[in-house]
Amino acid sequence: MSYVDSVIESVKAKNANEPEFIQAVTEVLTSLKPVIEAHPEYEAAGLLERIVEPERVVMFRVPWVDDQGKVQVNRGFRVQFNSCLGPYKGGLRLHPSVNLGIIKFLGFEQIFKNSLTTLPMGGGKGGCDFDPKGKSDAEVMRFCQSFMTELCKHIGADTDVPAGDIGTGAREIGYMFGQYKRIRNVWEGVLTGKGLTYGGSLARTEATGYGLIYFVEEYLKCNGDTFEGKTVSVSGSGNVAIYATEKAQQLGAKVVTLSDSTGWIYDPNGIDIALVKQIKEVERGRISEYAKRREGVEYHDGRGVWGVKVDIALPCATQNELFLEDAQALVANGAKIVAEGANMPTTMDATEYLQQSGVVFMPGKAANAGGVATSGLEMSQNSERLSWTFEEVDAKLKGIMVNIFHAADDAAREYGVEGDYVAGANIAGFKKLADAMLAQGIV
């Protein structure tokens, strides 16, 4: 059994009840085989065994009182995975599905994504099984204050800098930042995704979606093509989906689908992004509202967003949303590119099918790194006590995404897997991390 396979088997045995984590580790380590085989010093230093084991896992209870005066208790997590390249960096997810396996999978992916940005950031992730949907502002505030009362013991501007994620938007970040400042009596850039009035960065909201489009645009440019005239399907209707749609349309594409947890819409004339923003960002409504307010739009309950004829598909909702049958539908409908806006939205068998069918597949750790890259830029602005313009941040974001594309592309060519951006992104992210870990000794 090879070194890589033995580590994967060990991870499966130790983390048997964490399928998402096992999936992420298997995908990454399998793609690293050519690099590992070329560098026996990695095995000698136990590098893979150390990379798959978090440096620290914090799990804690989060008690809070609802509007009826009843005590509620949730479970909070922070997985500090790897600090070799900088302070731990990664979002806080608030969703009923959150468990240790999901947070570990997200934290593991984050190490490589952050490495790819070339900014000084390690990898981590956190969250809680709390659902902010249907809660009052007062309930969300009490939860966030309780959550941060424990989390603040483990984070800091030079230690661990959390950010937003699913369920954690500007409101939640604001409540958490206020509580951190109150307890620690220090104003520092301990969270990113903050409001513009207290240290946030312009273009942070748009960053992941815009960055995804910049990544795909660079691929198209290198192949003598553009977004002009392309038909695009997008899943989700949160920040990533909304701003990927906005930027794609600015570049001449026609986006025809969006979705949420209840169903999806098909607008053959192209999505009216202003209407989507009104429904999702202002009213916090369901995507079905869109079909009621616009002529010629189809609304369908449940799944099915990938059954439409498109050139480019952008899964931007959540992990494991694009299954094998969806991949088959995309190929049958002529999709040429699938780029992940969400974290690991495509199942492993769907990814393999897309690649074998000649579809250009762009993994989330590279394609959606714009969010964490702009978080890194927010950290820089906080450290300097400066605020950059939207145009400055957007230009830096585009530069980072272009560099990430070429890093993944070059790594794939170097190791004989040209055009395989999954392997290329994993190799490029891993090599920087591996060199730093070797330099810092067995820690």
Q: Where in this protein do the model-derived segments appear?
A:
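Active-site nucleophile and cofactor-binding loops and adjacent substrate-binding regions
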Residues: 69, 165-166, 201-208, 233-237, ...
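Rossmann-like adenosine-cofactor binding region
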Residues: 263-361, 366
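N-terminal ligand-binding/catalytic initiation module
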Residues: 1-202, 432-442
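Glycine-rich phosphate/diphosphate-binding loop of Rossmann-like nucleotide-binding domains
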Residues: 192-195, 200-307
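General beta-strand structural signal in soluble alpha/beta enzymes
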Residues: 159-163, 186-191, 234, 257-260, ...
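Adenosine-phosphate binding glycine-rich loop
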Residues: 2-24, 219, 331-443
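Predominant activation on well-ordered alpha-helical scaffold segments within soluble catalytic domains
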Residues: 8-9, 26, 33, 100, ...
